[in-house]
């Protein structure tokens, strides 16, 4: 077994260690010289700088910026720094003030010459100016009328018909196209207008359809729900109770109201809670159902939301599941083979058709097929074998009939009976003694009633139709 060495933790920088260990005196031996610049390399540079001037080259333990003047290419002269002197302000002369000097500082400088200004003349005696006074009694009249023609001032009012009082307008009758002059108050003015009928440009429809400003051409299809994406888990539910009681798969409660076509919201399941169906574990929401057609079936679908975890921000995270139940398959259309309707062999019945409501004489019927039934003769019901093929003088019509008894059928020629108003005589009870009957003639048939069939015994194979022969009973 290989032992893994513990990972070495990085030590703090020398500057950070120096701040804490210098006071306590627990610094490693390489921290203080590195921070204070007393390493062997620093001392060699300090000793060598005493005899060699290396200031311009920037060799030292500084930041490596080339000193004060910076790096200069070899063979060139370093730049000269010109000091621009700033002019200094002249000093203010401070005059000392003695203790006997006044503390009030005069704003004006003292002067020994005083200018008194011009002298005022004085008048003496009676000589001098003469003062006269005059008075006028005529008032001054000013003519303010300007020269030229007189000016006449007029005013004009412009009325807006949009703000005319509605009660003063006389509305014309419907369909009137002649001009009308409306006279109202002096402020309303006189207006004339004409009513123009509007034409309808609709070429189709009844006029009751909703009007749309931007009609969509063609037929717009509503997008169906996306239930078969990678984000949904497909789960098939075979229980038909999923159609009417979907909440019974999530909880054991039996609610009074269980919505069938709405979204169902459940409480958050507590850990360890059992559910009726394991496929519905951790379900907190079942969306409303949708009926879709998928691969030849009618499908009932619901989308469920699971509660798996909750983030610190309060967001619930869980998978989405598509639960579906197939209602019925949509089978393809079955092709039924139709038999052609051939014309009858008898040319006289070429245009005849079989009418199920027509009154067909029972004496004109001939039974050629097999089947079970009952025939009434004088109030007595006698079991007989009905046919599946009717032969009449109007043509042959085949009526399918399924018999529960295995009756042997043998093909033979169609027998057309002569038209007669009476049925062949059938004795009610057989004679006591057995008589032999010899029949010698042409074609004939035996009435099926004479051969009763027992349900318990197996029927013997017997030909019902004979032709050109002797029969002995």
Curated annotation (Swiss-Prot):
Disulfide bonds join 21-27. One of its GO terms (molecular function) is DNA binding. It is found in: Virion; Host nucleus; Host early endosome; Host Golgi apparatus. InterPro entries: Late_L2 (IPR000784). It holds the Pfam family Late_protein_L2. A motif (Nuclear localization signal) lies at residues 1-12, 452-462. Highly phosphorylated. GO terms for cellular component: host cell; host cell endosome; host cell Golgi apparatus; host cell nucleus; viral capsid. One of its GO terms (biological process) is microtubule-dependent intracellular transport of viral material towards nucleus. Keywords: Capsid protein, Cytoplasmic inwards viral transport, Disulfide bond, DNA-binding, Host endosome, Host Golgi apparatus, Host nucleus, Host-virus interaction, Late protein, Microtubular inwards viral transport, Phosphoprotein, Viral penetration into host nucleus, Virion, Virus entry into host cell. Its main location: virion. Belongs to the papillomaviridae L2 protein family. Minor protein of the capsid that localizes along the inner surface of the virion, within the central cavities beneath the L1 pentamers. Plays a role in capsid stabilization through interaction with the major capsid protein L1. Once the virion enters the host cell, L2 escorts the genomic DNA into the nucleus by promoting escape from the endosomal compartments and traffic through the host Golgi network. Interacts with major capsid protein L1. Interacts with E2; this interaction inhibits E2 transcriptional activity but not the DNA replication function E2. Interacts with host GADD45GIP1. Interacts with host HSPA8; this interaction is required for L2 nuclear translocation. Interacts with host importins KPNB2 and KPNB3. Forms a complex with importin alpha2-beta1 heterodimers via interaction with the importin alpha2 adapter. Interacts with host DYNLT1; this interaction is essential for virus intracellular transport during entry. This is Minor capsid protein L2.
């Amino acid at each position: 077994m290989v032992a893994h060495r513990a990972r070495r933790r990085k030590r703090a920088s020398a500057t950070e260690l120096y701040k804490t260990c210098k006071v306590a005196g627990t610094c490693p031996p390489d921290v203080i010289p590195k921070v204070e610049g007393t390493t062997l390399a620093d001392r060699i540079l300090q000793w060598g700088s005493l005899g060699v001037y290396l200031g311009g080259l920037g060799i030292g333990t500084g930041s490596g910026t080339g000193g004060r003047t910076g790096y200069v290419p070899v063979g060139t002269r370093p730049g000269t720094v010109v000091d621009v002197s700033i002019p200094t302000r002249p000093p203010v002369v401070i005059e000392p003030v003695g203790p006997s000097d006044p503390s009030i500082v005069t704003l004006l400088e003292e002067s020994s010459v005083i200018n008194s200004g011009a002298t005022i003349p004085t008048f003496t005696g009676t000589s001098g100016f003469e003062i006269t006074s005059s008075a006028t009694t005529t008032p001054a009249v000013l003519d303010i009328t300007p020269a030229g023609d007189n000016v006449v001032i007029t005013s004009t009012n412009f009325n807006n018909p949009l703000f005319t009082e509605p009660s003063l307008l006389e509305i014309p009758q419907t369909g009137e196209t002649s001009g009308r002059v409306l006279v109202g108050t002096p402020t309303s003015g006189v207006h004339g207008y004409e009513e123009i009928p509007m034409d309808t440009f609709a070429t189709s429809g009844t006029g009751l359809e909703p009007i749309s400003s931007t009609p969509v051409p063609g037929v717009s299809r509503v997008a169906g729900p996306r239930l078969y994406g990678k984000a949904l888990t497909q789960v098939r539910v075979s229980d038909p109770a999923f159609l009417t009681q979907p909440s019974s798969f999530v909880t054991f409660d039996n609610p009074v109201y269980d919505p069938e076509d709405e979204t169902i919201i459940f409480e958050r399941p507590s850990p360890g809670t059992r559910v009726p169906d394991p496929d519905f574990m951790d379900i907190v929401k079942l969306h409303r159902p949708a009926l879709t057609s998928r691969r030849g079936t009618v499908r009932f679908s619901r989308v469920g939301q699971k509660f798996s975890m909750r983030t610190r921000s309060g967001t619930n995270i869980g998978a989405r599941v598509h639960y579906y139940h197939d209602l019925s398959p949509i089978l393809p259309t079955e092709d039924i083979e139709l038999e052609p309707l051939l014309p009858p062999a008898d040319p006289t019945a070429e245009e005849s058709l079989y009418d199920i409501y027509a009154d067909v004489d029972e004496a004109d019927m001939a039974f050629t097929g097999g089947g079970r039934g009952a025939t009434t003769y004088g109030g007595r019901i006698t079991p007989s074998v009905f046919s599946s093929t009717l032969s009449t003088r109007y043509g042959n019509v085949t009526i399918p009939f399924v018999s529960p008894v295995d009756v042997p059928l043998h093909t033979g020629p169609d027998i057309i009976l002569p038209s007669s108003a009476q049925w062949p005589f059938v004795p009610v009870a057989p004679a006591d003694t057995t008589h032999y009957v010899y029949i010698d003639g042409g074609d004939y048939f035996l009435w099926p009633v004479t051969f009763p069939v027992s349900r318990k015994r197996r029927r013997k194979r017997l030909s019902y139709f004979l032709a050109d022969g002797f029969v002995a009973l």
